[in-house]
A protein has these predicted regions:
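Secretory targeting and sorting signals
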Residues: 2-28
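A Trp-anchored, charged/polar loop motif used as the substrate-binding/catalytic surface
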Residues: 47-53, 306-331, 374-382, 484-525
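Beta-strand elements within well-structured catalytic alpha/beta cores of enzymes
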Residues: 61-76, 97, 122, 336-341, ...
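Loop/turn elements at helix/coil->beta-strand transitions in domains of secreted/extracellular proteins
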Residues: 62-67, 99-105, 130, 150, ...
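Short, structured active-site-proximal loop/turn typified by the sulfatase FGly-forming signature C/S-X-P-X-R
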Residues: 77-130
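Extended, H/D-rich, highly charged conserved domains that either
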Residues: 203-335, 343
Length: 641
């Protein structure tokens, strides 16, 4: 999932909405340069305030709307050479970006590369050490007795550590926290302070994430909403989770009469009193449509798999759903909208109730991408009809990370997916076989069992299960403690026989202790959630903790569709995971091709003294999660556009 477009987004949107001049980006990346004129109130990085009134843009600047869309694991890179990538199979979206703006193909996500970490970095402009989510989508925290508990990365912005196993976790620090332990500044504040309503559709931690602590916290423990949680939790989830509008001060949309609640941000720099927000489909939908129930872009009522009308769940955020919410908000006084979209390589059922992985080019995968493309075609046509276009709207479309596909080869190797569907097997494997060589699944490794049987090490520990498992040794020993060093050596020696390839693999690729994690922006302001070390595994493997033996096989490839399956591995640092893409379209955005041109060959970039530019032969403009958040808006331009 994509990173640091947010600071750029604020900069460009503020400049455009305020009627300032966006200077040519020099030898640019295709992104707008910093605004050159206008007043500069504090807290907005030197950019002028947005002239919104009650949620409607009122300035003379070219930008009237901001639409930020972030996919979960949607790929620009091909996962199988003969099969077009996700973005190639969505031509309406891809052509919109490449024909009207810039498609950056050499951006990079953060470590550990997961959904929460990627999105939250993109919302905050901060590396994980300054926003609290170095290990995600969950993490562990040390308790006073030396054992560790579970913290969930997805929790509302002002929540403390959310441990679903207890209402009173011993770690009471903010889930989203700065390096000095305060609550991170919220991403909607630059817009709402300037008078613009800000909408969120499934966007991590800007919406209520659960009906446990979040609903009573926002609405009150004795509220009708809390009573609904107790009496009908399924409907309560659909009513209150996943959708929000954070309003400008005094905006009618978020009035108390419309069920607006105080938008409380206790540590916001400069204070944040008097603002209100709407939380949940139940209260947002009536403000953005006069025709209930709200429908997706295909004309279907938005509901979950059980028929609860409302938010369908975070794994049911197909483009037809997310883009419907976004369009309705934009048409009804919410000019700044952020949306999350589910991945395309898994079968999520009706609304995320199942999880079955497809292989590249498999029929269901290709069909799902076609439906995604149809949704974008309908969305862009609708916006055009509304007068929301590339000439007055800043579009940012990106992903939070890409993936490493774990699987064999298709049964029909010459397939392209589009005209000839690729055929794969979906079976459970514990040993190499003909079927397993064509399987679609990651390889699961029981780290506790392998440690005990291969090294005899039974030191108590827990992990955040992952392609890059974070180890938490009981007692929280120091990095240089003998028990830590021996444990690390033993973990580094583990091997496994891959049921798909038949090869014996060394499990560990790179092992990083706390000193290394600090260098990688992975040590946060909460020392209790810092792991003992992180092990970046061979990228085909997913490490977890099971029994301390291998009576049941410690290494399996569970690909049968009789249960949930996972084949798209991420968390690690390999290029197929961390190299991501971002598309930018709008006023002031230069139309650039990001890639090899006729004279753009290795070793010959035209590059001066500027950030984000390498003299080592990269054909693409290099970006990182926070690179675009810098005050520099002018990068190098390779020869040959």
């Amino acid at each position: 999932m994509r990173k640091r477009m947010f600071a750029l987004l604020v900069a460009v949107a503020v400049a455009g909405l305020a009627g300032t001049t966006i200077a040519p980006a020099g030898a640019a990346t295709g992104l707008p340069a910093k605004a050159s004129t206008g007043a500069s109130p504090p807290g907005l990085g030197g950019f002028p305030a947005l002239p919104c009134q009650d949620g409607a843009v009122a300035g003379a600047g070219p930008i009237k709307h901001v639409i930020y869309l972030q996919f979960d694991n949607v790929h620009l890179q091909r996962n199988l050479a003969g099969v077009p990538s996700d973005l190639e199979q969505m031509p309406h979206l891809r052509d919109f970006i490449t024909s009207n703006g810039t498609l950056l193909s050499n951006d990079h996500t953060v470590l550990i590369s997961h959904t929460a970490n990627g999105i939250l970095t993109s919302l905050t402009s901060l590396y994980p050490d300054r926003q609290g989510q170095a290990v995600s989508n969950s993490y562990r925290y040390y308790k006073p007795d030396g054992t560790s508990g579970v913290g969930v990365s997805f929790a509302y912005w002002t929540d403390s550590v959310f441990d679903p196993t207890t209402p009173t976790p011993t770690d009471t620090s903010y889930n989203m926290l700065t390096a000095d332990g305060r609550n991170d500044p919220a991403p909607w504040v630059p817009f709402t302070r300037a008078g613009c309503n800000w909408g969120a559709v499934g966007t991590a931690n800007t919406v209520l994430e659960n009906i446990g602590p979040d609903v009573p916290k926002v609405f009150g423990p004795g509220s009708p909403e809390a009573a609904e949680v107790a009496s009908d939790p399924g409907q309560a989830f659909a009513d209150f989770v996943g959708i929000a509008v954070h309003c400008a001060k005094g905006a009618a949309m978020c009035s108390t009469g419309n069920h607006g609640r105080p938008d409380v941000l206790p540590d916001e720099p400069g204070g944040y009193d008097g603002y209100q927000a709407l939380f949940g489909h139940k209260y947002v939908a009536p403000q953005i449509t006069s025709s209930l129930p709200l429908k997706d872009l295909s004309g279907n009522v938005i509901q979950d798999a059980s028929g609860h009308v409302g938010f369908p769940g975070f794994d049911g955020m197909f483009p037809s759903v997310t883009l419907s919410y976004i369009a309705q908000m934009q048409e009804h006084g919410v000019p700044v909208t952020f949306g999350y979209l589910s991945d395309a390589h898994d079968d999520h059922g009706v609304a995320g109730e199942i999880h079955k992985s497809y292989g590249p080019g498999e029929a269901g995968y290709v069909q799902q991408l076609r439906s995604y493309d149809r949704a974008f075609a309908a969305f862009l046509t609708r916006l055009e009809r509304d007068g929301i276009t590339k000439d007055n709207t800043l579009f940012v479309i990106t992903t939070e990370e890409e993936d490493h596909f774990v699987g064999g080869t298709p049964l029909n190797p010459g397939c392209d997916g589009v005209t000839t569907p690729c055929q794969w097997t979906h079976v459970d494997c514990t040993a190499p076989s003909a079927d397993c060589s064509h399987n679609v699944t990651e390889v699961n490794a029981n780290l506790r069992g392998l440690l005990a049987t291969q090294t005899g090490n039974t030191t108590p520990f827990q992990v955040h299960a992952d392609m890059a498992p974070a180890f938490y040794l009981d007692g929280n020993p120091a990095p240089d403690a003998p028990i830590t060093r021996q444990f690390e050596r033993d973990v580094g020696s583990l091997t496994a026989t891959n049921p798909i390839t038949g090869q014996t693999d060394r499990l560990s690729d790179k092992l990083v202790d706390r000193v290394g994690m600090d260098a990688l922006h992975m040590v946060t302001g909460d020392p209790l959630r810092t792991p003992t070390f992180v092990d970046f595994l061979d990228d085909d493997y997913f490490g977890f903790t099971g029994p301390p033996d291998c009576a049941s096989p410690c290494v399996t490839a569970p690909g049968s569709w009789s249960h949930a399956t996972f084949a798209w591995n991420h968390g690690g640092y390999t290029p197929d995971i961390v190299r991501i893409w971002a598309g930018v379209v709008g006023p002031g955005v230069q139309h650039r091709r990001d890639g090899a041109g006729r004279r753009d060959r290795p070793g010959r970039p035209r590059c001066g003294r500027c950030p984000g530019c390498s003299r080592r032969g990269s054909r693409r403009r290099w970006g990182a999660t926070t690179t675009l958040a810098r005050s520099h808006r002018s990068w190098c331009s390779p020869v040959g556009r």
